A protein has these predicted regions:
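Mg2+-dependent phosphoryl-transfer enzymes with acidic/Ser/Thr/Gly-rich catalytic loops
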Residues: 1-5, 21, 141, 148-230
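Active-site phosphate-binding/coordination module
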Residues: 17-106
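Short, structured coil segments at secondary-structure junctions
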Residues: 56-59, 67, 125-126, 180-181, ...
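Conserved ATP-driven motor cores of ASCE-family P-loop NTPases powering translocation/secretion/packaging/pilus
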Residues: 58, 390, 397-458
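Conserved acidic, metal-coordinating active-site core of Asp-based
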Residues: 87-181
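P-loop NTPase catalytic phosphate-binding loop
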Residues: 230-363, 373-392, 396-400, 405-408
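Terminal, compositionally biased segments used for targeting/anchoring and flexible tails
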Residues: 438-575
Length: 575
């Protein structure tokens, strides 16, 4: 995991008896010294915090105060209130009940024993306030305000991602911000409920636990803790017994292999959608324009192809990749092969730089990876060395990749069992190959089925059905709609007597000719199953071919069969 943010509570976590010790301050300074951002998340009011911790402005990149109702950026001395000021009617009702309290910019603070009286005052006045406990303290917060909402505002302002964040706390009011942390840590003397929900509990209490965690884990990018973070695993599908098939969100190096038109793109699309659904950022290099439909999902931007948005230059890409909520699909389908390789290499160089600085994008997916990382070697391979970031390479066969890339995977998925075994052999050697064979049953994969091998520890194989995609997949859209297929893959309208010789080298030309030939020619090819065979075998679209085959069995007349065939092709490929 790339830890770029360390968010901590104050009282009972880094501070004991109001103050931060010298040892704790030095540990926190070491975190910032590595370039990581240090955020303080506290229930205290800002003036009170600055009184008990005079070095707060120097120590922290941002402060979430008043339990999320106020945020403060020390470098620019900027304060933002995120909730309504305390209502005068509420304050008067509390005074009448003898409740002692302090007033912040948006918070009312008192002691836990006065909870009943505070709730009575809220009911009487009808204001929207939430009671939040912090051990012996009680806070009356504006509705919807938590430490989590305040921290989210800070992360947004600093363009940081919670998926690169560790959070540590000790009390009831820390639940919200720990829940949004990629790794939630509780000190050993935290309240029981917080310890139960945490991903990790320190051995030592309070500030000593924080120092322990920083020295043992934060400065090492959580390498020993990442395997525990199973709540973040991405579900690719399920086995026959409904067991989910997952890959870790962090540090996964996934290789997807298999012959053309067997479902690799579908499996890759499932992975991409699961990454996006989890709120992580994605960069997808798309040589054939297969993944443009991902733009239908929120926060996904497609560049290149025949679209309105040109591919970004390296400096523009550098800026785009630094937005944690934005994912990019770079469609290279309008380029020549040499141009694709050159541009992709520049993209990988920029991505390596941005990832080192920010941990973004969380996933890098390279389709047709053998073009950029060929078996004979490539300078681009040096830009993809093992790290904490996740990577997916998609290719026909492992042998098509540079040797270093064959050994890179921690997980291999395939739509063909033979290709899977070859990839495992390339990655781990004969011993692991025998192990994976022993774990699989040796049967060929059925259509719509895939297999996956986890290589990190004891290699094992599982057969599974990939999950359902949310958006329509259009395979090699530009290539088949506007490119030029060779004669042996083109469709020829010859008619029942063979007197015609009209070549359709792509789908756009096919639609044009099919719409213009006489009915006898159209019906001849329809009844002979020629359309079905071409769509299945040359366009590599078995789903559309199956639809047309269904029409062939329905006994449609010439005019209606032509209309329905064209309607389905146009709907699928927008030609």
């Amino acid at each position: 995991m790339n830890v770029h943010v360390f968010a901590t509570d104050y009282d009972g976590t880094i501070a004991e008896r109001n103050a931060v010790s010298e040892a704790t301050a030095k540990a926190l300074e070491r975190v910032r010294g590595t370039g990581r951002k240090l955020l303080l998340v506290t229930g205290r009011m800002l003036p009170d915090l600055q009184r008990v911790c005079p070095d707060a402005d120097r120590m922290f990149d941002a402060v979430v105060a008043e339990n999320g109702a106020l945020v403060y950026f020390p470098e620019r001395r900027e304060v933002r209130r995120l909730g309504d000021a305390p209502e005068p009617a509420l304050l008067e009702a509390l005074r009448r009940r003898g409740v002692p309290f302090d007033v912040g910019s948006a918070i009312v603070a008192t002691d836990a024993p006065f909870a009943e009286a505070a709730l009575s005052a809220i009911r009487e006045t009808g204001v929207e306030r939430t009671l939040v406990f912090n051990k012996d303290a009680l806070m009356l917060l504006p509705g919807g305000v938590t430490k989590g909402t305040g921290l989210a505002a800070v992360l947004g302002a600093l363009e940081l991602s919670p998926h690169n964040m560790v959070g540590i706390g000790d009390a009831e009011n820390d639940h919200a911000f720990l829940a949004m942390s990629e790794c939630a840590v509780a000190v050993s003397d935290a309240v029981p409920a917080l310890r139960e929900r945490a991903d990790y509990v320190t051995r030592a209490p309070a500030a000593r636990g924080v120092v322990e965690f920083i020295e043992e884990h934060v400065l090492r990018d959580l390498v020993d803790i990442v395997p525990r973070l199973k709540r973040h695993h991405l579900v690719l599908g399920e086995q026959a017994d409904a067991t989910p098939v997952t890959v870790p969100a962090h540090g996964t190096r996934l290789l997807v292999v298999g012959p053309s038109a067997t479902g690799k793109s579908t499996l890759t699309g499932v992975l991409a959608e699961r990454v996006l659904e989890s709120g992580r950022s994605l960069l997808l290099l798309d040589p054939e324009g297969d993944y443009r439909t991902l733009a239908e999902l929120e926060h996904v931007v497609v560049f290149g192809g025949k679209g309105e948005q040109a591919l970004p230059a390296p400096d523009e890409l550098d800026q785009l990749l630094r937005h944690p909520s934005t994912s990019l699909v770079l469609d290279l389908s309008a380029m020549s092969m040499a141009e694709k390789v050159g541009y992709a290499t520049k993209v990988l160089a920029v991505t390596a730089t941005v990832r080192a600085a920010t941990g973004l994008p969380h996933w890098l997916v390279i389709d047709e990876a053998h073009h950029v990382l060929p078996a004979e070697g490539s300078p681009a391979a040096d830009l993809l060395q093992p790290g904490a970031e996740s990577l997916a390479l998609i290719t026909l066969a492992a042998g098509d990749l540079a040797p270093a890339m064959r050994r890179l995977p921690t997980v291999i998925a395939s739509t063909d069992m033979g290709a899977l075994h070859e990839a495992v052999l390339s990655a781990r050697g004969a011993r692991d190959l025998m192990s994976t064979r022993a774990s699989g049953d040796g049967r060929a994969l059925e259509r719509g089925e895939a297999a996956i091998a986890w290589l990190a520890r004891d290699p094992r194989v599982a057969r599974f059905r990939p999950g359902t995609r949310r958006v329509l997949h259009r395979r090699h859209v530009r290539k088949y709609t506007e490119g030029e297929l060779p004669p042996d893959r083109s469709f020829f309208f010859r008619g029942p007597t063979g007197s015609l010789n009209l070549r359709a080298a792509n789908l756009a030309r096919f639609v044009e000719l099919a719409d213009g030939v006489d009915e006898a020619t159209s019906q001849h090819h329809f009844q002979q199953g020629d359309y079905t065979r071409w769509l299945r075998d040359q366009i590599k679209d078995p789903e559309l071919a199956a639809e047309i085959a269904g029409l062939e069995r329905s006994g449609l007349g010439a005019a209606e069969s032509r209309r329905q065939v064209l309607e389905r092709v146009r709907q699928k490929y927008a030609v």
